[in-house]
């Protein structure tokens, strides 16, 4: 192989780079990637189109179904010169027309008859193009799908394209028409498709002239008349159509350039469900793909089949829609093993990313000696009151998908830690719900953001702020931590002293935990998070570590109140958030929106409007003992009355008619962040569309069958 042959040419600047280069040396453009996704080749009658293609070039001798655009692959030699040789030039405007055109496409001038001395090659009539190799990725694009159209018959009711062996439409169950009607319908569609393909190729011009060459079918009289009428009509809007095609082509190219291997495998699996190809689903599963993944707007646009694909659809939705019972059994098994969940952050990834950017923009660092990071916005997440308007079966499905039932059971039934007061949970509408989140070391950060903004800390924005605050304000937090640990040990009768080096080693370990994504966090990190939020954090948790046999191993020390004591009180909010702790896992505890009743609590006239939701969070446990306040200094430590006084200074407290000391958490849908409100509405719309009488496994009816 020569030196020229082993190099790859850049698709932007045409510079020839060495094979080891992953980017262009001149313009730094990314090296084009090859074919990624393959599936079994179609068994069509027009398989001779790709006869010169070697199946061994792809894995398993299969041909690709969905792959990146041809612009993202290494360039192949174009057949542009061959196409131009077969075209005839108009004697009026010199436009190069297709050989079968009897009039000029641009000026509609009559084609001149061939001169007796003119060679067949120059005129283009009667000459046959030389066979060439077809790009496998372009063999199955929209233009070459004309060759496989004979395998399908179109339903006369819903226009769905069914396979040839289907006796009735798989969407609407309409019986297949007789052979004469089917042939006429197929001919009509083929004629219109040919017209559209000619139009597309003409407006793309030289940009698309290097694509796969097609063999033209014999032109009938009816086709000629239709094409002539179509050409006359389209000339008026030619410029606008060309610009729209160019914009659409550029947009699709940008989307394809952002796609990764997993994305192509997912799209291939979606098409595999529609076409009945189980191998595509197996390929996606074997790559570690998420079965519950949903289609985005860009992916739907790339698939370009609105009748089959819609935003938010999963593989399960598609299997139900197209009645793939064998695939549905496999997919539902996978989803059940993953204990499928659907929280608001999962429904709309685009809104979730915008919320993450809002959080990052609202993080600022305080100037001065105490250079701690803080959030500028006060946001409290609550479950929408519209949930109660849903049918009972739909409500049960919603709670199964958004709540952590195991945590809820452990905090409510196994130990009376939350919702133990009937007065708070029922009469005052302050029942707490444990939201599901990732069961990893990031659960504390996830639960904090879920209790405020309703999303995960996926990009570790909050973890980075936590680490930077601990590092920049290390002296302040270290002093509080050291004094608290010494007092806590002495309160249990453990009288010991550590060298300063040992204290420093333990503190360095706490700092290292904050910088490692996925690392479990401790009480000190909750104390720092209270300063970042500028609001108190109340943790309701189990008191003891237990083994798998149920044996008590030690105290957990997480339950209690964490106040932002190092800030000024005027700089902080008094509305707290609540977290739950069970066996090494944190969960966000949120309430449901209520009507904002007045005069709730003994002598407490709230004087609030109906839009404000007030949740009463108990500051005592089920035994009516005051919750511990963590990280108090020696001057702030005292008896229970002094700690209650401190709580009243940092929280809006009141006593209910039952004598329970509570803190008021206030939230308002109208004053909440609009992105959070929009995300919750989109999530709730998913359940509003579910019919209560459904018998489908995923709880959704196929609402669009009649629109197909």
Curated annotation (Swiss-Prot):
It is found in: Cytoplasm; Nucleus. Pfam families: AnkUBD, OTU, Zn_ribbon_RanBP. GO terms for biological process: cell migration; cytoskeleton organization; positive regulation of Wnt signaling pathway; protein deubiquitination involved in ubiquitin-dependent protein catabolic process; protein K29-linked deubiquitination; protein K33-linked deubiquitination; protein K63-linked deubiquitination; regulation of cell morphogenesis. A zinc finger (RanBP2-type) spans 3-33, 84-113, 149-178. Residues 209-219 have a biased composition (Polar residues). GO terms for molecular function: cysteine-type deubiquitinase activity; K63-linked polyubiquitin modification-dependent protein binding; zinc ion binding. GO terms for cellular component: cytoplasm; cytosol; nucleoplasm; nucleus. It catalyses: Thiol-dependent hydrolysis of ester, thioester, amide, peptide and isopeptide bonds formed by the C-terminal Gly of ubiquitin (a 76-residue protein attached to proteins as an intracellular targeting signal). Zn(2+) 1 binds at residues 10, 13, 24, 27. The active site is at residues 443, 585. It comes from the Eukaryota. Zn(2+) 2 binds at residues 90, 93, 104, 107. Its EC number is 3.4.19.12. InterPro entries: AnkUBD, OTU_Deubiquitinase, OTU_dom, Znf_RanBP2, Znf_RanBP2_sf, ZRANB1_OTU. Its main location: cytoplasm. Residues 38-73, 202-224 are annotated as: Disordered. Residues 432-592 form the OTU domain. Ubiquitin thioesterase, which specifically hydrolyzes 'Lys-29'-linked and 'Lys-33'-linked diubiquitin. Also cleaves 'Lys-63'-linked chains, but with 40-fold less efficiency compared to 'Lys-29'-linked ones. Positive regulator of the Wnt signaling pathway that deubiquitinates APC protein, a negative regulator of Wnt-mediated transcription. Acts as a regulator of autophagy by mediating deubiquitination of PIK3C3/VPS34, thereby promoting autophagosome maturation. Plays a role in the regulation of cell morphology and cytoskeletal organization. Belongs to the peptidase C64 family. The RanBP2-type zinc fingers, also called NZFs, mediate the interaction with ubiquitin and determine linkage specificity. RanBP2-type zinc fingers 1 and 2 (also named NZF1 and NZF2) specifically recognize and bind 'Lys-29'- and 'Lys-33'-linked ubiquitin. RanBP2-type zinc finger 3 (also named NZF3) binds 'Lys-33'-linked ubiquitin and shows weak binding to 'Lys-6'-, 'Lys-48'- and 'Lys-63'-linked ubiquitin chains but it does not interact with 'Lys-29'-linked chains. The OTU domain mediates the deubiquitinating activity. This is Ubiquitin thioesterase Zranb1. It comes from Mus musculus (Mouse).
């Amino acid at each position: 192989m020569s030196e020229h042959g082993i190099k790859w040419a850049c698709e932007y600047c045409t510079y020839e780079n060495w094979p080891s280069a992953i980017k262009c040396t001149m313009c730094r453009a990314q090296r084009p990637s090859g074919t990624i996704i393959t599936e079994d080749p179609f068994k069509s009658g027009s398989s001779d189109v790709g006869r010169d293609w070697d199946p061994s070039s792809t894995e398993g001798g299969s041909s690709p179904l969905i792959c990146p655009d041809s612009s993202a692959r290494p360039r192949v030699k174009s057949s542009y010169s061959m196409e131009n040789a077969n075209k005839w030039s108009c004697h009026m405007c010199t436009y190069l027309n297709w050989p079968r055109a009897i009039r000029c496409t641009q000026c509609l001038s009559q084609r001149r008859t061939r001169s007796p001395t003119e060679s067949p090659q120059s005129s283009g009539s009667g000459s046959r193009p030389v066979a060439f190799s077809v790009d496998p990725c372009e063999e199955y694009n929209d233009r070459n799908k004309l060759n496989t159209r004979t395998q399908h018959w179109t339903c006369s009711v819903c226009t769905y394209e069914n396979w040839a062996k289907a006796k009735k439409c798989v969407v609407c169950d309409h019986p297949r028409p007789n052979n004469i009607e089917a042939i006429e319908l197929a001919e009509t569609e083929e004629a219109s498709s040919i017209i559209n393909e000619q139009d597309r190729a003409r407006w793309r011009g030289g940009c698309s002239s290097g694509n796969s060459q097609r063999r033209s079918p014999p032109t009938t009289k009816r086709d000629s008349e239709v094409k002539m009428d179509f050409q006359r009509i389209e000339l008026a809007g030619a410029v606008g159509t060309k610009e729209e095609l160019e914009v659409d082509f550029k947009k699709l190219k940008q989307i394809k350039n952002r796609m990764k291997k997993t994305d192509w495998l997912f799209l291939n699996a979606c098409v595999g469900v529609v076409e009945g190809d189980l191998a595509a689903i197996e390929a996606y599963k074997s790559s570690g793909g998420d079965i519950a993944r949903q289609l985005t707007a860009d992916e739907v646009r790339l698939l370009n089949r609105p009748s089959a694909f819609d935003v938010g659809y999963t593989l399960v939705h598609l299997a139900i829609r197209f009645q793939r019972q064998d695939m549905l059994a496999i997919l539902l098994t996978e989803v059940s093993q993953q204990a499928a969940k659907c929280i608001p952050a999962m429904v709309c990834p685009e809104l979730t990313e915008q919320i993450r950017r809002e959080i990052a923009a609202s993080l600022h660092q305080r100037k001065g000696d105490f250079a701690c990071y803080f959030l500028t916005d006060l946001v409290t997440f609550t479950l929408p009151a519209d949930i109660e308007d849903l049918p009972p079966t739909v409500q049960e499905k919603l709670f199964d998908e958004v709540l952590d039932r195991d945590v809820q059971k452990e905090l409510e039934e196994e130990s009376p830690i939350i919702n133990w007061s009937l007065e708070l949970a029922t009469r005052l509408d302050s029942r707490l719900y444990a939201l599901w989140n990732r069961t990893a070391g990031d659960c504390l950060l996830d639960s904090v953001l879920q209790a405020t903004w309703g999303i995960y800390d996926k990009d570790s924005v909050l973890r980075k702020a936590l680490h930077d605050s601990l590092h920049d304000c290390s002296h302040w937090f270290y002093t509080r931590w050291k004094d608290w640990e010494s007092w806590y040990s002495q309160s249990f009768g453990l009288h010991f002293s550590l060298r300063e080096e040992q204290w420093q080693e333990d503190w360095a370990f706490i700092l290292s935990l904050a910088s490692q994504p996925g690392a479990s966090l401790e009480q000190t990190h909750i104390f720092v998070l209270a300063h970042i939020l500028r609001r108190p954090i109340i943790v309701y948790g189990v008191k003891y570590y237990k083994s798998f046999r149920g044996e008590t191993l030690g105290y957990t020390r997480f339950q209690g109140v964490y106040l932002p004591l190092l800030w000024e009180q005027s700089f902080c909010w008094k509305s707290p958030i609540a977290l739950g702790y069970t066996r090494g896992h944190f969960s966000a505890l949120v309430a449901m929106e209520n009507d904002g009743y007045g005069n709730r609590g003994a002598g407490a006239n709230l004087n609030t409007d109906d839009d404000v939701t007030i949740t009463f969070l108990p500051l005592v446990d089920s035994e009516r003992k005051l919750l511990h306040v963590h990280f108090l200094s020696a001057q702030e430590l005292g008896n229970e009355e002094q700690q209650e006084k401190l709580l009243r200074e940092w929280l809006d407290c009141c006593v209910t008619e039952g004598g329970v000391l509570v803190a008021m958490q206030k939230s308002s849908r109208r004053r909440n962040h609009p992105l959070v409100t929009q995300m919750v509405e989109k999530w709730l719309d998913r359940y509003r569309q579910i019919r209560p009488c459904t018998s489908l496994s995923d709880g959704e009816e196929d609402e669009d069958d009649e629109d197909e």
